[in-house]
Amino acid sequence: DVEYEQRYQAALSLFNKRQYRAAIEQFEALVAANPNHSLADNAQYWIGECYYLLGDYRAAILAFEKVFTFKNSNKNEDAQYKLGLCYYNLKDRERARQEFQTFIDNYKNSKLIRKAEEYLARL
């Protein structure tokens, strides 16, 4: 519905202004209000991005993992890549290796494939 989309755009605007904590609150409210809305998976993804940019990689991991609970999400690819980056930044080499390998196996045509392969080569 229109109101949900307006609230989503407002939350995205906060993200773009680097007001990540405020954006997290707004995105979480959207997911809670209607987890079946077509933008709910995107809202969940942006929660992960906010935490990632705040340097809270553990919270980002939890948020990105929730993206996969949404059916047919268009954010699965990006969430999988970001999981690799989160573990990489946490210096968890084994888990980062797993996540990047999963990304490479599942998203062979991704524009991020080369970057994922570069990270994997560093591990």
For each feature predicted by the language model, list its residue ranges:
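Acidic, proline-/serine-/threonine-rich low-complexity intrinsically disordered segments
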Residues: D1-A10, L14
